[in-house]
């Protein structure tokens, strides 16, 4: 009897969690693209013990948006907003460090400084695009990733890597696949969470959510994509840190 | 550098006999077939040595189709290509067969007419490939210039930096002529050019001491891994296909053509080799499955992943080379030289494509560009991708038949008989 009640209760809980987790949006990401393979222990304890979460985003230009109020519409800002919505009662701050045109090696060298300044519980590191643009050797790229991840660990932060954008129009000129493979492999090997932006955006393109081939000078689509990335990223963080909103409320 | 897996060193059995052997064994059927296919090239028959193995044309033709399909990004049809079912892909097949045919054609020239003439022909072939590569580069530039002029999206402000090289056409074009600047998917022909440039002395050695030559090639391969050397690329980095690593496959193909295949036949026919090859192919299949089905990834033990990854295409990872060998062993076993299927009209289109590999390869690269362009312009779905893929292969086949017809017509012209046998000998190309 207790077993059945337990099962029923969990079904209700899971159902509620799913309902709460599902954003009212047109850009949902299927579960298989957000595998909860790792724990973000420092994030978990920052929220559970201190009700506070500091996140640093370190990335190149695809982590930012140009145009009027670009920063406000870029995914780091969207992430902050979504985390605040989904983790109410916590002090949440996302700081973006955009290193335009910097390779992974250059960013890795700057990471200790960023971590010392921000003292974040979570460092989101977006990398790969500039390396693909500049033709960095994938092996050197791997070494730089390792160095950067070491720096993040030394700075007492959880790490989350983000790979490049899916850009179908430049695919015949810019080969990102080898770099995506390296990131996947490094994530696997070190047990670091990887936000697979490439696969997620490709999924949106395949599903017709966004027409990523379209030529436009307007910011509407770019903002919408960043909004969706911010939300998906928040979902993955909450998932990997086991911070499901409903469970949080029950524990408090 | 990446730790090279050690337990699967190139498993090339080196037989004791080192007699230079120009001619592979031949069956009457194969001979008549090759004679038939080379009707336009009387010199091939006249030489009377081993005739062309139609399996080479067949598999090179198939490899050309697969390379075309793989070169269209976002192509649903590319799911059928072998790279999704194992470690190696069509590139390995293409390079191996190219080495095999190069040795077959130029080996005979070198044996009969000397080192200088054979070298001159090899270098002329390299020049032809160079010209073809530059032609493809021009088409690529046209596409890029079009995208640069028409495509804009703030979302891709960063990615569009790739077009910056258009701002320096002097540097870019010069680097392209030096084969240092190579657009995506245009790496195979430069590799082929370098392999041919280095081929004359290698062929000389292969004809005299084939096993020594092969061992030398393996040493260069090992050194390339150990010392991490490769040719430089522009603006950065190195060649996508490291010629010092990939030469092993080319030389191995050449070695097989010059009697190595004959010497290996007992190994290839043994049951143990077959079992090992099939087991390895199944293993590779299981591993590649975990790349496509994320949830299966956890079944790959960490120690295995640590040892195995990354599987390096640039330096022809040993796992890839072994996978190609396994594929070859199984293929040779089940598709004998005199297999009647080689005469069936169903396989004829692939064979004809394989017999004109340079033209069809270039056409394939161009069609991949064009197909991708159509798909991008129309934001086409799976249906259009399928249509583009099928139409592309039909165009490749039609062109191959046209070239065949053209060569036959030229061959009938009495004046052209004076022409020396070329790489196109026996209906195929080096």
Give the residues covered by each predicted segment.
Chain A
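Sec-dependent signal peptide recognition
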Residues: 2-9
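N-terminal signal peptide c-region/cleavage motif recognized by signal peptidases
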Residues: 14-20
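Serine-esterase "nucleophile elbow" of acetyl-processing enzymes
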Residues: 24-96, 112-119
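Internal alpha/beta domain cores that form substrate/cofactor-binding pockets in large enzymes
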Residues: 54-56, 90-118, 130-161
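Solvent-exposed loop/turn segments at secondary-structure junctions
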Residues: 61-64, 99-105, 128-134, 165-169, ...
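Short, solvent-exposed loop/turn segments at secondary-structure boundaries
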Residues: 66-71, 135-139, 171-175
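Active-site segments of SGNH/GDSL-like serine hydrolases
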Residues: 126-129, 148-180
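Catalytic His-Asp segment of secreted/periplasmic serine-dependent ester chemistry enzymes
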Residues: 167-252
């Amino acid at each position: 009897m207790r077993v059945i009640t337990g099962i029923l209760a969990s079904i209700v809980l899971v159902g509620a969690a799913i309902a709460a987790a599902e954003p009212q949006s047109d850009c949902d990401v299927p579960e298989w693209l957000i595998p909860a393979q790792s724990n973000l222990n420092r994030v978990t304890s920052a929220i559970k013990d201190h009700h506070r979460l500091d996140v640093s985003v370190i990335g190149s230009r695809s982590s930012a948006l140009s145009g009027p109020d670009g920063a406000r519409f870029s995914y780091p800002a969207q992430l902050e907003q979504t985390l605040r919505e989904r983790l109410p009662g916590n002090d949440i701050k996302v700081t973006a460090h955009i290193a335009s045109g910097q390779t992974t090696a250059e960013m890795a060298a700057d990471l200790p400084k960023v971590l010392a300044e921000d003292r974040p519980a979570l460092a989101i590191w977006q990398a790969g695009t500039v390396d693909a643009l500049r033709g960095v050797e994938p092996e050197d790229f791997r070494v730089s990733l390792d160095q950067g991840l070491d720096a993040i660990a030394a700075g007492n932060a959880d790490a989350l890597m983000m790979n490049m954008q899916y850009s179908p129009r430049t695919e015949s000129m810019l080969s990102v696949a080898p770099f995506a493979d390296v990131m996947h492999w490094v994530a696997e090997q070190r047990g670091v969470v990887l936000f697979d932006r490439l696969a997620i955006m490709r999924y949106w393109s395949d599903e017709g959510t966004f027409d990523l081939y379209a030529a436009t000078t307007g910011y509407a689509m770019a903002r919408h994509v960043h909004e969706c990335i911010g939300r998906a990223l928040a979902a993955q963080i909450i998932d990997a840190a086991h911070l499901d909103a409903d469970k949080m409320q029950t524990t408090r | 550098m990446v730790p090279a897996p050690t337990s699967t060193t190139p498993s090339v059995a080196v037989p004791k006999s080192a007699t230079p052997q120009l001619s592979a064994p031949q069956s009457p059927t194969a001979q008549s077939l090759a004679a038939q296919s080379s009707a336009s090239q009387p010199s091939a028959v006249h030489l009377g040595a081993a005739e062309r193995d139609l399996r080479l044309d067949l598999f090179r033709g198939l490899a050309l189709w697969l390379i075309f399909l793989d070169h269209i990004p976002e192509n649903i049809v590319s799911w059928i290509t072998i790279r999704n079912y194992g470690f190696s892909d069509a590139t390995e097949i293409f390079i191996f067969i190219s080495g095999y045919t190069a040795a077959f054609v130029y080996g005979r020239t070198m044996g009969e007419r000397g080192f200088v003439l054979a070298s001159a022909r090899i270098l002329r072939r390299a020049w032809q490939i160079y010209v073809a590569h530059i032609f493809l580069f021009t088409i690529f530039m046209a596409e890029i210039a079009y995208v640069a002029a028409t495509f804009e999206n703030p979302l891709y402000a960063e990615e569009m930096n790739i077009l910056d090289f258009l701002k320096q056409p002097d540097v870019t074009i010069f680097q392209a002529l030096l084969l240092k600047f190579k657009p995506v998917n245009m790496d195979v022909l430069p590799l082929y050019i370098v392999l041919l440039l280095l081929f004359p002395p290698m062929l000389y050695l292969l004809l005299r001491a084939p096993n020594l030559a092969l061992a030398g090639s393996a040493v260069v391969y090992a050194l390339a891994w150990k010392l991490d050397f490769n040719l430089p690329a522009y603006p950065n980095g190195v060649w996508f296909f490291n010629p010092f690593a990939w030469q092993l496959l080319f030389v191995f193909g050449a070695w097989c053509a010059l009697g190595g295949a004959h010497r290996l036949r007992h190994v290839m026919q043994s049951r143990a080799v077959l079992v090992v090859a099939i087991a390895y192919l199944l293993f590779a299949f299981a591993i590649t499955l975990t790349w496509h089905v994320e949830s299966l990834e956890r079944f790959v033990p960490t120690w295995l992943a640590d040892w195995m990854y990354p599987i390096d295409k640039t330096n022809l990872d040993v796992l890839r080379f072994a996978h190609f060998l396994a594929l070859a062993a199984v293929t040779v076993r089940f598709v004998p030289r005199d297999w009647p299927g080689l005469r069936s009209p169903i396989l004829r289109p692939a064979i004809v494509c394989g017999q004109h590999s340079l033209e069809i390869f270039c056409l394939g690269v161009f069609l991949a560009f064009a197909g991708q362009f159509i798909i991008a312009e129309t934001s086409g779905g799976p249906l259009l991708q399928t249509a583009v893929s099928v139409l592309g292969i039909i165009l490749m086949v039609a062109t191959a038949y046209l070239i065949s017809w053209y060569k036959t017509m030229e061959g009938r012209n009495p004046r052209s008989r004076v022409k020396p046998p070329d790489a196109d000998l026996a209906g195929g190309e080096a």
